[in-house]
């Protein structure tokens, strides 16, 4: 869903619209690849790849803008419902394997189904409330930024708290990072050539969001390298003891 009607775009933006559209296509490829990769990795490692809160928030966003505020064009609806179907697969692997990661917390372990239901419902109510407040076109963009930050924070915290790399890989990290990063050039083009409807993209809050996203997701790759190295060192030490 576009924040502004493309038919209202000024001529100078239409000249570079193909670049923005290419960025959007690459975003779709990156995230589709990431969803498929997460499903495969989760089934293979018998765990879940995306942090639970981030997953519930993202899944609630998909539900909100597929069922309550569906995308306008046929192409947008197809792309969005395809993403929703893949996200259902990601959610399935999380529901199936979450108990394997919460043995240290009996309270969470015993209430995982309830936690999933409450979190998805709660986040969905927030997305709907924001859409009612500022309008669905603007809300879907703003709430997507919130989903991205929660995903970045949750993924990094999950990696550090687990202390292992099951459910994680450089491929998953890069496809997610690339899929979100490629939208930054699109936003720059919109702010430069179509500023009247995209003024917020030059705001301090948006600039802060981009910087925090780069910091968190960039740190994830570094932390994953350290975790992998620790796992290798531990495996070598264990073999020497034998």
From Swiss-Prot:
Pathway(s) of this molecule: Secondary metabolite biosynthesis; terpenoid biosynthesis
GO biological process annotation, one example: terpenoid biosynthetic process
A GO term, aspect molecular function: lyase activity
Practical applications according to UniProt: Diterpenoid pyrones display various biological activities and FDDP E shows anti-HIV activity. FDDP D and FDDP E show also inhibitory activity of 42-mer-amyloid beta aggregation that is involved in the pathogenesis of Alzheimer's disease.
GO CC annotation, single: membrane
Topology term for the membrane: Multi-pass membrane protein
UniProt entry tagged with the keyword Cytoplasm: no
Group of enzyme by EC: lyase
Main location: membrane
Coiled-coil positions: none
Location within or outside the cell: Membrane
Regions crossing the membrane: 15-37, 51-71, 75-95, 112-132, 141-161, 169-189, 205-225
UniProt-listed Enzyme Commission number(s): 4.2.3.-
Similarity comment text for this entry: Belongs to the paxB family.
UniProt function note: Terpene cyclase; part of the gene cluster that mediates the biosynthesis of diterpenoid pyrones. The first step of the pathway is the synthesis of the alpha-pyrone moiety by the polyketide synthase dpfgA via condensation of one acetyl-CoA starter unit with 3 malonyl-CoA units and 2 methylations. The alpha-pyrone is then combined with geranylgeranyl pyrophosphate (GGPP) formed by the GGPP synthase dpfgD through the action of the prenyltransferase dpfgC to yield a linear alpha-pyrone diterpenoid.
Name of the protein described by the UniProt record: Terpene cyclase dpfgB
Species assigned in the record: Gibberella zeae (strain ATCC MYA-4620 / CBS 123657 / FGSC 9075 / NRRL 31084 / PH-1)
Lineage, broadest ranks: Eukaryota, Fungi, Dikarya, Ascomycota, Pezizomycotina
């Amino acid at each position: 869903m576009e924040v502004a009607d493309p038919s209202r775009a000024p001529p100078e933006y239409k000249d570079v619209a193909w670049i923005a559209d290419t960025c959007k296509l690459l975003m779709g490829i990156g995230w589709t690849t990431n969803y498929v990769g997460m499903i495969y990795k989760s089934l293979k490692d018998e765990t879940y790849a995306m942090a639970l809160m981030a997953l519930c928030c993202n899944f609630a966003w998909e539900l909100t803008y597929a069922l309550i505020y569906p995308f306008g064009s046929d192409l947008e609806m197809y792309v969005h419902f395809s993403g929703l179907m893949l996200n259902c697969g990601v959610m399935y692997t999380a529901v199936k394997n979450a108990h394997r990661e919460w043995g240290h917390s009996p309270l969470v372990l015993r209430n995982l189904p309830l936690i999933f239901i409450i979190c998805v419902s709660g986040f969905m109510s927030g997305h709907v409330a924001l859409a009612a407040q500022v309008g669905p076109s603007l809300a879907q963009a703003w709430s997507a930024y919130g989903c991205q930050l929660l995903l970045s924070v949750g993924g990094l915290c999950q990696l550090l708290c687990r202390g292992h790399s099951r459910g994680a890989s450089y491929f998953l990290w890069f496809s997610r990072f690339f899929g979100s990063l490629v939208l930054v050039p699109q936003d720059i083009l919109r702010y430069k050539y179509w500023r009247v409807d995209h003024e917020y993209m030059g705001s301090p809050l948006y600039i802060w969001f981009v910087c925090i996203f780069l910091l968190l997701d960039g740190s994830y790759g570094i932390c994953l390298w350290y975790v992998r190295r620790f796992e290798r060192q531990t495996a070598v030490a264990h073999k020497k003891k034998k």
